[in-house]
């Protein structure tokens, strides 16, 4: 690949063929080069030598961009134009500036496929929602529907199952499998979580350290796949976390969160209705529910990001909302990561500056940290195994590496309350276990409280003490 972009090229020449009838999973660690391989397949980057040859028969079009569709699930609302801020989803006065779902879906030439997709993903109930109001899982359903309606010859999907509830994941497996049987569609899945490989996949291509491995059958891959250790975090790092000194600005209240008969509406749609919820100091909550059930909306109230909280009976860290406290007085107690946060951080800053922005809860770094604060940033980057990325620009990192940087940002000020909304999105199996280890160790410290959202039961750390399940409608 183009030699003036060394970070965007494979270290060795790529030999790869997608033969008729094949469906491939590309697997590898975060930062291994999986996305670079996709960019090579799609023709995004010019090559140093040779060329990518295409034969899209029986499609009448010969153009790669018409036959190959690539969905990169990056938790974004539309294009990355820099105009999005992560609280925007909760501000009703911004809604008129964003389109409705129905305005963005193309006309379908195959009415049967359209009906199947609409039923599978519940698109009918989304049609009159503003695109910015879609939850992370709903956004994935919209993106999948939009792309599949265009009848691609080759469909490339980057981690398509993350963010989807278990029922929808199973249905998507089935739908893709059926489409590969009754149409000429061929599928390439880019997977960080290699145990997400569906049964219709025929071959696997491992990618490691920007080297494309040999294509092998799924059965061959499953036979040689190595298990991940039950614990990744070293004893030395575990002790460092447990021995962290406590800061002097701790809250002194038994109840961290108190919600009394809280209801949230957007237009005619009720997201939360008469919700009572108390989170006590030291509790570790798992928050779950189907896509679109209101999980992220609930967290936006706790994080002081949702303006509707002022009209509700909500007490955070012992102070009732609307009693004169600033949002920054609330946020200083909270470490937070979410799909919306990831979307807002598509900024070309050094990774360590992204981590440092967590000290002041800003999107971007507007105040240079003190030396001891920068040392804390480097400390947490080392804990998450990304110390070598500190000077790399954020946009040069893979999606999984970006997520690790944002996790370091959430922990950097040693918060009393951790709010982790699908924190393991896009992480490979090794890094998932590492992050789980860090979370469990951190939460063993006195009076540390956590709220975590995930659609994968196995992602929940062993320290979870309480469960809240939200039902849609």
Predicted regions and their residues:
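Conserved beta-strand-loop-alpha-helix hinge in the C-terminal portion
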Residues: 199, 209-237, 462, 470-473
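Catalytic Walker B motif of ABC-type/P-loop ATPase nucleotide-binding domains
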Residues: 155-159, 418-422
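The feature captures the beta-strand-to-loop junction immediately N-terminal to the Walker
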Residues: 27-29, 288-290
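Conserved ABC ATPase "signature" region
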Residues: 109-126, 356, 371-389
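Hydrophobic anchor residue at the start of the ABC signature
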Residues: 143-144, 407
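Conserved ABC ATPase signature
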Residues: 130-134, 138, 367-369, 393-397, ...
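ABC ATPase nucleotide-binding domain signature region
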Residues: 38-109, 299-363
